[in-house]
Amino acid sequence: MAMQREAGVQDFVLLDQVSMEKFMDNLRKRFQNGSIYTYIGEVCVSMNPYRQMNIYGPETIRKYKGRELFENAPHLFAIADSAYRVLKQRQQDTCILISGESGAGKTEASKIIMKYIAAVTNAQGQNEIERVKNVLIQSNAILETFGNAKTNRNDNSSRFGKYMDIEFDYKADPVGGIITNYLLEKSRVVQQQPGERNFHSFYQLLRGANDNELRQYELQKETGKYHYLNQGSMDILTEKSDYKGTCNAFKTLGFSTDEVQTIWRTIAAVLHLGNVEFQTIEDELVISNKQHLKSTAKLLQVTETELSTALTKRVIAAGGNVMQKDHNATQAEYGKDALAKAIYDRLFTWIISRINRAILFRGSKTQARFNSVIGVLDIYGFEIFDSNSFEQFCINYCNEKLQQLFIELVLKQEQEEYQREGIEWTNIEYFNNKIICDLVEQPHKGIIAIMDEACLSVGKVTDDTLLGAMDKNLSKHPHYTSRQLKPTDKELKHREDFRITHYAGDVIYNINGFIEKNKDTLYQDFKRLLHNSKDANLSEMWPEGAQDIKKTTKRPLTAGTLFQRSMADLVVTLLKKEPFYVRCIKPNDLKSSTVFDEERVEHQVRYLGLLENLRVRRAGFVHRQRYDKFLLRYKMISQYTWPNFRAGSDRDGVRVLIEEKKFAQDVKYGHTKIFIRSPRTLFALEHQRNEMIPHIVTLLQKRVRGWIVRRNFKKMKAAITIVRAYKAYKLRSYVQELANRLRKAKQMRDYGKSIQWPQPPLAGRKVEAKLHRMFDFWRANMILHKYPRSEWPQLRLQIIAATALAGRRPYWGQARRWVGDYLANSQENSGYEAYNGSIKNIRNHPADGETFQQVLFSSFVKKFNHFNKQANRAFIVSDSTIHKLDGIKNKFKDMKRTIKIRELTSISVSPGRDQLIVFHSSKNKDLVFSLESEYTPLKEDRIGEVVGIVCKKYHDLTGTELRVNVTTNISCRLDGKARIITVEAASNVEVPNFRPKEGNIIFEVPAAYCV
């Protein structure tokens, strides 16, 4: 440890007794002495000092650079340096996880870590690396402006989650990075709790911009004039200087003037939008204060009429039809607030993507694979407000996941590894919060799944309904309760509140708004409006607005599900890296630099699991490594193991090395790994290794470098010359041989299709593919030029049908003209008018939501069903489905029997002249048809036409080929039951018909029909 005098112990591991009383006593002494950092091994416990500390200057940075944790007093710089050294020495990705509740100092901790990394890198002073460092530092100012806000507990609270990967090259200099954001609390844009403020950006614009800028945005300095700002606190912080800092950060990150203008115009537009008011006059909804509407439209660069229409009306598209519905005042207010929240959320996401473009590694993908990263996680802390809503629910779930990760990595895995390796160990009990994570995220049973089910339900579903569903499904969960489940609990409001017992304590959530916030609905009208903005940057934020107005949009994933998935992805990312922990603690709720609230601090120590962490650390080991890797890294420091140890196993070699260096008292030998207890031992090993490496490298360079370079150069030069000449020769030979073979292709009947192409050389594989395409294009033109272009669609279908049937059915209508929609023809169908009406009705009111544009084929049929009955029906093939219709007597009524073409598994037909066809469905409900005309059997074969059309559409929809069976014994499934259809010739039959026989089906046809 450093020799300076400090209160208490610098590492909790050194406490003479492990108890909550001793832990708290040490924490209190250090806080009152101004020592805000204390270790638990390699975990840093950070107390928010609520004052400026003079411990972050250049001199302090130099003091911690390249030093081990135990060499200096505890500091965030030491944690940052440890993470950086692991990356530099082992090329191992690392991450620094900063956790703690809101106001505990997480954001400041992340900035201090970033400052240190920027200070200790780029020793050679390269301009590009210096630019990247500045961009990484300055990005924080922008993110705080647009993502942070004043809450009752924290003047600069992050209202979004941030994870930054800083990318380092092989010299361990920063070359780029990428920021991922999580769940911006956008509801704060339109409403704040008493004493809290909106995002800093609004106040910076009003109080920091000059008069000319405010006139340009048609704004006034008084925040009280704006509805979205006057609901909460109007305290003045440091907005004027912060505004200048934000604008300077924009310049540093390379934002153009146009982009910065878009950002501030959008912020101003949200303020004006909040002041738009609605009034109902003679049953008509109107906007009463047109000036704010006009200002909003101007700033968003849309027309006033378009904005007014989007706010007061809604376009509804269904079945290709478009209609407009008027809003009432309540709906208009909801739409306005939803628009304001969405605008700010999209702007924030766009700003982060723009920052990422500035800091993203500019090297090639090949280079990027070899880079290492340090991840810094600064995410919202655990929150308990007077009124806790959907946002607090998501934030606290996020903290549960991070706590679970900490438990998994620090407590659970470490103890399990000791037991697995045979290290003597006394198991330490701890609370595993997996049960709380499951309460939220468990599929089908968790709160998010219950919310999603409620959001997807048909009809009006209220928050009260959702709470009832949660009570029903979670009534027996030990960490969930509500007033309905606990009628005597007066703390909970009836039909409004529910309580979750989190690892950090009980939180009462108000259910009101959960459904709306989870759905996160925004009318398509607003997306179209902003996509059509003349501001190109704003338009870029709304790509969905380009969608056709008639197109019905799919229901997007809910906010809860998206957040759950993002948390799962974050955990996967963190598990790939070696973690370092900073556990932030809030000393009091008064933001005082002197008050140490015992109860408040002890509560945080308990739920963060710091005492359990201490017990594991005291009994555990600072480092462990597989024997083979340990020996590979340190073998050069011992004469007995360098250059290779041949006197036994890797374990024996490690033991020899450790005993020679006199570290045997500080290590334990597991089954597959060595465990080192003290960081001093690891430091000594690293120090000796670092002293040896220059000598080894110099020796190797002296002996080998010159020989390798000369040999490789000669080999490479010779190889390139030979390969280049050989490739050119083989390619010329191939092209000449091909030209000779294809010389008479134009005079051949098949235009050279039967000509065998020569085998291309390896260097000519790509050329061969291009030559094949050129030849196929030429040959197709030679074949098709004698046919009118109007016949090409039928010709294409006939080719598809011929390919599918593969010569297995001699008669398939190849010699006639194919019409397709026969029932729409008056010569084929006396009831064609009724048929056309039925098709129109089906198109406008699809039974299963599957719409279609056109009918590709239609015919009268005789169908056979699972009741062993045949009946006269009709069917159509559309561009997506196969529909069964009633017969002409019932005016072709839709029988609600549909097979989606993409759900077909195959088609079966017979080889004869009969018109039998079976459509096999993946749902085991096949369709069995015999094609007919209205009054008599068909005089022409139409099976080939049906096969060609269905096979083409199936390929269009799925990208794969549909199997076609040609046989007289067809297996099918009618309503799930397996049946066999046998085609039999019958001398006394004039018209084909079906009849049941012993559970199967006989299809009787005239003898002349059989092959």
Swiss-Prot record:
Keyword Iron-sulfur appears in the UniProt entry: no
CDD domains recorded: MYSc_Myo1 (cd01378)
UniProt protein name: Unconventional myosin ID
GO biological process, any: actin filament organization
Domain IQ: 694-714, 716-736
Description of how the protein assembles with itself and partners: Binds to F-actin. Interacts with arm. Interacts with shg. Interacts with ds (via intracellular region).
Compartment annotation: Cytoplasm; Cytoplasm, Cell cortex; Cytoplasm, Cytoskeleton; Cell membrane
Membrane topology note: Peripheral membrane protein
Phenotype seen when the gene is deleted: Viable and fertile. Mutant embryos and adults display normal foregut left-right asymmetry, but inverted left-right asymmetry of the midgut and hindgut. RNAi-mediated knockdown in the hindgut at 0 to 24 hours after pupation leads to inverted left-right asymmetry of the adult hindgut, but knockdown at later stages has little or no effect. Adults display inverted left-right asymmetry of the male genitalia.
Major subcellular site: cytoplasm
Function: Unconventional myosin that functions as actin-based motor protein with ATPase activity. Binds to membranes enriched in phosphatidylinositol 4-5-bisphosphate, and can glide along actin filaments when anchored to a lipid bilayer. Generates left-right asymmetry at the level of single cells, organs and the whole body via its interaction with the actin cytoskeleton, both in the embryo and the adult. Normal left-right asymmetry of the larval midgut and hindgut requires expression in the embryonic hindgut epithelium during a critical time period, 10 to 12.75 hours after egg laying.
Protein family (similarity comment): Belongs to the TRAFAC class myosin-kinesin ATPase superfamily. Myosin family.
Comment on protein domains: The myosin motor domain contains the derminants for dextral twisting.
Tissue: In the embryo, expressed in gastric caeca, midgut cells of the proventriculus, and in the mid and hindgut. In the larval gut brush border, expression is in the terminal web domain. In the adult gut brush border, expression remains in the web domain and has also moved into the microvilli. Also expressed at low levels in follicle cells during oogenesis.
Keywords of this entry: Actin-binding, ATP-binding, Calmodulin-binding, Cell junction, Cell membrane, Cell projection, Cytoplasm, Cytoskeleton, Developmental protein, Lipid-binding, Membrane, Motor protein, Myosin, Nucleotide-binding, Repeat
Sequence positions that bind ATP: 100-107
Domain TH1: 806-1007
GO cellular component terms, semicolon-separated: actin cytoskeleton; adherens junction; cell cortex; cytoplasm; microvillus; myosin complex; plasma membrane
The keyword Nucleotide-binding appears for this protein: yes
Annotated ranges, domain Myosin motor: 7-690
InterPro entries membership: IQ_motif_EF-hand-BS, Kinesin_motor_dom_sf, Myosin_head_motor_dom-like, Myosin_TH1, MYSc_Myo1, P-loop_NTPase
One annotated GO molecular function: ATP binding
Effect ascribed to mutating residue 106 to A: Loss of function in specification of gut left-right asymmetry
Leftover remarks: Overexpression throughout the embryo reverses the normal left-right asymmetry of the embryonic gut, giving rise to a gut that is a mirror-image of the wild-type. Ectopic expression in the larval epidermis causes dextral twisting of the entire larval body. Ectopic expression in tracheal precursor cells causes dextral spiraling of tracheal branches, giving rise to a spiraling ribbon shape instead of the normal smooth tube.
Naturally occurring in which organism (per UniProt): Drosophila melanogaster (Fruit fly)
